[in-house]
Amino acid sequence: METVGTKRDLYWLMPLMGVDDGVIISKRGEVTIGWELSLPVVYDLTEEGYDEMVMAFANAAKLLPAWTMIHRQDVFTYDQWKGEYDGNYLHDCFNAHFEGRRYLRHRQFLYITMSSKGSALKANSQSAAFGIRFTAGFPKAQDLWMFANKADEFISVVTSCLHVQARRLTQEDIEGVGIEPGLVDSYLSVWQGGPLRSDLVLSPESMRVFDNTLTGFKVSEADDLPGEVPDVARIGDGSSYELFLSYSSALGVRLDCEHVVNQYILMPNQADVLRDLDRKKKKMTSMQNSPENRVNAKEINDFIDAVHRDGMTTCYHHLNVLAWGPEGTELEIKGKVSAALSSMGVTAVQALSDLPSLFFAGVPGGACEIGKDNLMIQELTSMVCMGLNETFEKDVEGGLVLVSDRMRNVPVRIDFQRRARALKWIDNYNVFLLGPSGSGKSFFTNYFLQQCYDAGEHIFVIDVGDSYEGLCALINESSGGRDGVYMTWDVEHPFSFNPFIGYTGWLDRQGNIRQDESGVTFLMSFLTTAWKPASGWNSDSLAILERIIADFVVWARRTVPPGELPVFDDFYNFLVRQIAPRIIPVRDEKGEIVRLPEHPYLVGELPVTPEDFDVGRFIRSLSSYSATGSYSFLLNDKHPKDLFSSRFTVFEVLKLSEGNALFYSLCVLCIMNAFDHKMRNASGFKRMVVDEAWKAIANETMAPYLKGLWKTSRKYFCSAMVVTQELDDIISSDVIKEAILMNSDIKVLLNQEKNANRFGQLESLMGLSEHQKNLILSMKQYQVYIGMNKHCGVYQIEASRQQALAFESEKEKKAPTLERARQLGSIRLAIDEQVNEEKSVG
């Protein structure tokens, strides 16, 4: 048999009288204050973090006056993902890929209600759901003032653990504004757009609200609970990793249906509770002819002893789950909720005749309608453990990158740059990315750089292997050729640079080299890599080299016409004509010294000898880079091209890497130095990505330049990013460890299954905490770990088919798309045509 209640009946039955300045007042005279809580993200906390949250909540509850009801309400509702389209091809394809995808949203509300023993512990039969008339009895002004102060103190302690933030609910939140429903109307329509637009239908096993059937399960008896309520739920594979969630998380973020979790904690007068328990024990003892009574009497006695012995705080507790869905989904929903409760070791008890009471008690401000028969006496801290203490990934306002929440597979906006630095999670923007072969390293880097470019960043890539060919071509096409410059080295079109850009500022007032000048550091790195003394570079030989550079700058200032730049050939000739004759003595045919230099080259008032600095061998080593040398093109560009007016530039150096190793290293260093100039002079955020090409410069002579670049990048609103795939490369390279890894606050790791047996080395190298290690080992394919010192998370990487084709890095797989692009004259048309063909095939 069904009972139908009209909207008029419903509002007559409502336990609420009204809302005044954000305070809910019930018809029984109870007063409720509420907050919306912001919780930690799933897998964000360690076991200790959950303990801190539980203790903060328990301590806060102990501050409240006797007979205060705490109502913690978690609301999980479905929504559909909606993209923000801006006309950008790949961005819009990404949005279209996810458009309309259903996902769960979560909000948690916390209410405290000032009540009395008689009101809070009334019989279920007196619930508003059964048409009981209310007798008003409003609290005094002094009591309200004291309660408001206690509420402030309560929420201050709740948030003291720093894992939770709270926002006080306002009049508008509760009542709504205009056509926007407030929390009360939203609850009564089970979040289907309220206010309630249909009758409320009651049946023996369910309720129908609006077009949804609502089913309830309750935990209101001690026998329903496991022997001991755990602090947390442990999530893991049983061997390699272990992560933590709330004990009741199976009812929260892991329960895939629309539902509300209501937790009620009534803080009683402790003496009253013990007296009531003692009376109940004596009653049971007097009827010991029943074995059940004897067991109950012993359990009550043990509980009283534990309270006295351990100083425990008692409370009345109730928890229920109200879940709903369209007609015909009742059995599926019941199965999900029942399975979730069973996984917690909790007996699943369906709410039948008392379902209306539970529903009305969930109305904001109606917590005391729960009724005494639905409450059980328990220890406070254990019951607090049954609360939900995590939520889904949340969008970061103004976040740069869209990734996917790995639990819901919908995009969330995150930021590990400006916002992260503002929160003091990082001190620089530098990124170190490690992705073993097959982990999707190139795909993720393309995915990331596309979004950085769309956000207005200047992107500069040094690559080995054409990993960014498709993305660069697409950017070039969409920007009309302004951006997306793809430079591949070959003999006919070699790279050409000028090492003396900004040289006039290289000296201080005393005429000494300024060590903090990037141009100086670059030139020193170039020269010390191009040639090494037999005994290696030492402080004396380096001091001589610095003096030579300083003297060249003085000479160039005098001789190079204004507006022009010296080139490397000028430096080479300066060495030959003005430095070498002042160091190398004149010798006869037998090699005997005939005459010492007439004007010896002095450094620190001491003459430099060939033994101090073998300038002859030095000159011979540099001759390859002079105007007549085999690499004359590299450093002799008097009018260097503006390679960086493009906001997306790729230097592909695979052919270089297959040739002379020394020249390859020096060429990569020159490319990085060119970016250094852009970093210091271009406006906006700049990003340099060195993908595998870093191996060419991972040596001791270039380390000072790299360390300087990585350390100063922050000052120029820049990110230096290294991408690599081999763990051995990091372990074996002190340059990577000291110059790059230690100066990169952002660590990005892709699936590390291939490094599972050597993970201890990676853990030690990167200084990972136990929690970070567990997060990384929990990753599956197409997931990414992003760590910002102590703050970290794992995200799903999912993209549209169009993005996948643009980001493809394997030559055989991307060849058909690139060939089609050549035929059509458009890579975008080629991608669209290929996607449409794939769809037609099915």
Where are these regions (language model features)?
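Extended, folded cores of ATP/NTP-driven motor/assembly subunits in large transport
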Residues: 1-389
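A short, charged
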Residues: 433-457, 819-842
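P-loop NTPase motor domains
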Residues: 47-63, 346-347, 357-412, 418, ...
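Conserved P-loop NTPase motor cores
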Residues: 417-439, 443-450, 460-462, 466-468, ...
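Short secondary-structure boundary/capping segments
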Residues: 85-89, 124-129, 365-368, 474-479, ...
